[in-house]
Structures are given as structure tokens and as C-alpha cells.
Amino acid sequence: MVAEDAAGIGTNKIGALAALGYDYAELLLCGLAKLPEEAFWQVQNELTQSGLRCEACNGFFPTDFRLTGPDIKKDQIREYIARALDRAGALGVERVVFGSGPAKSVPSGFPVSEGWKQVAEMLHDAGEIARQYQILIAIEPLRRQESNFINTYQEGCRLAKDVAHPNVKSLVDFYHLVEEQ
């Protein structure tokens, strides 16, 4: 689906997807999270009227967010996660994909091991919030052209194991898997 709406969410395609017989829509969570309340409820109404569910969301974090490095803002991250997952919960989302390449990339000169700890802690906190909505967070390893961090399925599995939260797992995207071989 190519998003043509102002927020880049793809809501302009909901009616067409329903008419074509699609089972569900996968929307951009960072776009949903930044919508004003009224615009968000319009998205929910469009989904309801179309009969289409939003079972999954991609784009957990916006590209300008920093999840690793010396200047992360933990309070801002927690507030964002709470808002984003609240929105996902209101739509009945079951899975949120954490690829978020630019947001998770480790800044040059910053220890990767420290970035790993930061992301693991953040995902554990996110898992606690996700549990309230019965949402599963799926770690998506991305090819190196999109991020310098969590690039292989093995790394995604290791991160999920380190997070040790039942609402945080790893997924494999065939495209990224093949690109990293």
C-alpha cells in the first residue's frame, strides 16, 4: 500500500483494500501516534465503516527519534511508547513491528554494547505497556542499508531473549534475511 494521506499512514487506501477483499490493514504507528485526537478517531471510524481491521502496525518509531546514544531522552521515549501503544490498542492491533532503522541505529563512536542495553531496556518497558493491550512487539532485523543495528535474524532473536518479556518476540522478514546473507 502506498500512503498518500498527509500523515503517511495509508488511511486513504482503507476503503479500496476492503473493496478488494483484504483481510486487514497494516498502518504506520508513528503516523497514528502523532495525529490529533479528532484525526485519530476519523481513522478508527474509517476502519469501522470499511469492516477492515488493523491487525498490525509497522513504523513503531519516527525516523527522527533517538533510541540509542548519549543523548536519548528516556522520559520522552516512555511517553511516546505509551501514546503509540494506546492508539494501537484502541484500534485492536495485535502486533507492532519494531524495525525503526534510523531510530535504533547506533551513533558513530557510541559503544554498540551500550546501544544494545538501551534498546533492550526500552523494549522491556514497551513490553509492559503492550501487555496491557495484549499487543505483541515484533523485533524486525533490517538490512545494513537501513540500520547499523540488529541486522540479522540471529541478532533479533538474541535481543528478544535479552529483553525476556512475553510480549516482545522476533520476526524474520524474508527480504531483509536474503539481503543480509
Cite the ranges covered by each PLM segment.
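Glycine-rich tight-turn/loop motif centered on a GG-T
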Residues: T68-I72, P107-W116
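Secondary-structure boundary/capping motif
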Residues: I9, L35, P107, S147-N148, ...
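Active-site-proximal loop/turn and secondary-structure-junction residues that shape catalytic pockets
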Residues: V2-A3, L29-G31, F60-T63, P102-K104, ...
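Active-site groove signature of glycoside hydrolases
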Residues: A90-G109, Y133-R143
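N-terminal pre-domain/capping segments
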Residues: M1-V93, H124, K161, H165
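Residues at alpha-helix caps and immediate loop-helix transition turns in enzyme cores, especially N-
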Residues: I9, A39, P111, F149-E155
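Acidic/histidine-rich catalytic cores of soluble enzymes
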Residues: Y24-A25, C57, A120-Q181
